[in-house]
């Protein structure tokens, strides 16, 4: 898969504890500047590059902001590893929203990014005007959490990109059975970087694993009540059919809380769908159409 040739600018903002954090900013055309921006928030070990294809499809029609959470990508690493928890990420996002003077936005959150989305919606109702929750809900399955605890922060490195891609396929091949060599290479180049010694390394601070070493350290707060913040708006719930992190039961329970919620199950994918799947791209277009329709209804 080739890298989209879509221009973006690199933006930076400061966290409350003095970290310089990074985002990619894909602009909207002037005639679409009235629309709320789409903010993409990645998963635990991931970064802004995960949303290249999504941003390429939406840029121009919408402003798209893809963030690197603290300790990932081009954002600074935290001085205190125990700040690698959802409530701190929410504070960081609050600082971004304030710096960019964003009052309303659409949130696309994968895994951890979805948890952050729910928390942002609950702390100030009305500012999240639409959401995509990618393979995550208020309840995380123990098997998936155990798998994450086993691999995060391992600090592996590889001599070539092909070695890195092969390692990913060995670990995740069972939940992405349809991936080609090109797909694995694309995944590797989004998740990893060339390290100082020339070897391929994961593009995150290995210390993000430290909260997982504390019993209950990754648990945070009960997230079921936060769904109320998304109840008034359109929500697309994407679930990988082979996910071990996000169960069918949790997804169905969420639909009972979200009157405008829709569930899309992506076949032959585990945790988490890339959002580049054709059916997901179509569903994102529908979601944003619903956001537009709600805005027009409010103005009428």
Segments predicted by a language model, with ranges:
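Conserved alpha/beta-hydrolase catalytic His-Asp/Glu region
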Residues: 159-214
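Serine-hydrolase catalytic-loop signature spanning alpha/beta hydrolases and amidase-signature enzymes
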Residues: 43-53, 64
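Catalytic histidine-centered segment of alpha/beta-hydrolase-like enzymes
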Residues: 269-278
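The conserved beta1-alpha1 loop
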Residues: 39-43, 239
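Active-site loop/oxyanion-hole signature of alpha/beta-hydrolase fold enzymes
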Residues: 24-30, 52-59, 66-108, 286
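Conserved serine/cysteine hydrolase catalytic core
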Residues: 194-256
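Alpha/beta-hydrolase fold catalytic core
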Residues: 1-38, 60-61, 102, 279, ...
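Conserved hydrolase catalytic core segment
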Residues: 103-142
